Amino acid sequence: GDILASLADGKVAAYATDFPTDAQLGVPGVIAIPHLGASTPESEDNCAVMAADELIGYIERGEVKNSVNLPELTPPAEFEKRVCVIYKDGEGVRENIVAALGGNITSLNSAAKNGLGYLVCDTPNPDSERITAVSGVVRMRII
């Protein structure tokens, strides 16, 4: 209808749609793209499952995926005791956290995004008071 007339008389240069009608298919200026189905019941179910899996990964392993405010981080799946620290990303903060962890670190992963750092460390005897006393530490938990 109206969009085809507007394309024909030059009022509209191009029209992109993910729901082209049969009449729009093959018309110059109509850009037909695949419909991603982001609002279908199936996609909403898939998104809910994905979000639940990501939350489980964070709670059980300290893993962060698809976060708005924290960096992506996938620590090793196997561990005995794990320390997860969210901190303000500033000069020396990460190093001070590592120093507070002491020795006997079996795995250490960290990343930063938008002014926040996230550190995951596997160590057998973390001192939570010493770690939370580091300037810049926002939150710390032991898994």
Describe each PLM feature range.
Residues K65, N69-I143:
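A conserved regulatory-domain signal marking ACT and ACT-like small-molecule sensing domains
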Residues G1-A77, Y118-V120, N125, I143:
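Rossmann-like dinucleotide-binding domain for NAD(H)/NADP(H)
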